[in-house]
């Protein structure tokens, strides 16, 4: 909004000219979302405590230490969604189609998560919306996003770029739409599975969003994309501001979500954040890189898949003491804080590997 309002004065005012730079608006986006999170956080938490009689339902078969979390309110993802959307609408170019498509997906996945959280807190169990129903809704939203990208963006690409290789890419044709849906839905659920401990998912999400802030900026810049031999995608640079907003809102949320958590992001936060990271990876044509920088989410998801299939195949035996993987380490005697910090370190390593693919090819 501010960019569009100040656009006529960019060449006449030094202050207005600052808003011409994506880097300036991105840095400002982090500060705005961080400040807004600090401002609305305490009020939102108090409201959620009043609204939710029992708070987030705690699994009885989980680690014993988790029973102390009973009564902690969920739906804290509302804070992330509100602050991120406000900052993006305030600082991004509102004529940019990518911004609106991304915001649509972000809010839509957040609504799915909200419905799931609402079902959990009203029924006082951890089941929520049925898995198949939730998956169907995610698929529909992802399909709508893909259709919007297909028919509202000039020259949509169906190419799948392979990182670490200069010219290795595959034209998937219209099969790319199904691949994109898989990426978006998969990312949404992967982040959701990872969000099981205080602060565990928040930092990896911020790191991944920060990575895609850089990627969006590079592929949206003709000079940098040519230098790094990346596919140039005009107008994607504005997504840098949205990604920066996610970073700021996650850091602000972490203030209240650090152990012992005052609030959980719930599916409202995890489904929306995972889904929008998937959407941005599709727009920037770095879907595989998302699987690398978000490697922690992939590992957590694989651990669940392995556990389920092995349990069914062996009629009751388990590979892990409990899935997702972070619960296995808790059951093995690691403290919650040790699991969280070590998983943050692992996430940072994956991010560095993923970002190295931008240059090493």
Swiss-Prot record:
TM stretches of this protein: 28-48, 74-94, 99-119, 135-155, 167-187, 203-223, 236-256, 263-283, 288-308, 338-358
SS bond partners: none
InterPro entries per record: Glycosyl_transferase_4, PNAcMuramoyl-5peptid_Trfase, PNAcMuramoyl-5peptid_Trfase_CS
Names of the cofactor(s): Mg(2+)
Catalytic activity: UDP-N-acetyl-alpha-D-muramoyl-L-alanyl-gamma-D-glutamyl-meso-2,6-diaminopimeloyl-D-alanyl-D-alanine + di-trans,octa-cis-undecaprenyl phosphate = di-trans,octa-cis-undecaprenyl diphospho-N-acetyl-alpha-D-muramoyl-L-alanyl-D-glutamyl-meso-2,6-diaminopimeloyl-D-alanyl-D-alanine + UMP
Single biological process term from Gene Ontology: cell division
GO function term, MF aspect, one: metal ion binding
GO terms for cellular component: plasma membrane
Subcellular location: Cell inner membrane
Keywords, in A-Z order: Cell cycle, Cell division, Cell inner membrane, Cell membrane, Cell shape, Cell wall biogenesis/degradation, Magnesium, Membrane, Metal-binding, Peptidoglycan synthesis, Transferase, Transmembrane, Transmembrane helix
Membrane topology: Multi-pass membrane protein
Pathway where this protein functions: Cell wall biogenesis; peptidoglycan biosynthesis
Superkingdom, natural source: Bacteria
EC category: transferase
HAMAP family: MraY
Reported function: Catalyzes the initial step of the lipid cycle reactions in the biosynthesis of the cell wall peptidoglycan: transfers peptidoglycan precursor phospho-MurNAc-pentapeptide from UDP-MurNAc-pentapeptide onto the lipid carrier undecaprenyl phosphate, yielding undecaprenyl-pyrophosphoryl-MurNAc-pentapeptide, known as lipid I.
Family: Belongs to the glycosyltransferase 4 family. MraY subfamily.
Protein name: Phospho-N-acetylmuramoyl-pentapeptide-transferase
Biological source species: Rickettsia bellii (strain RML369-C)
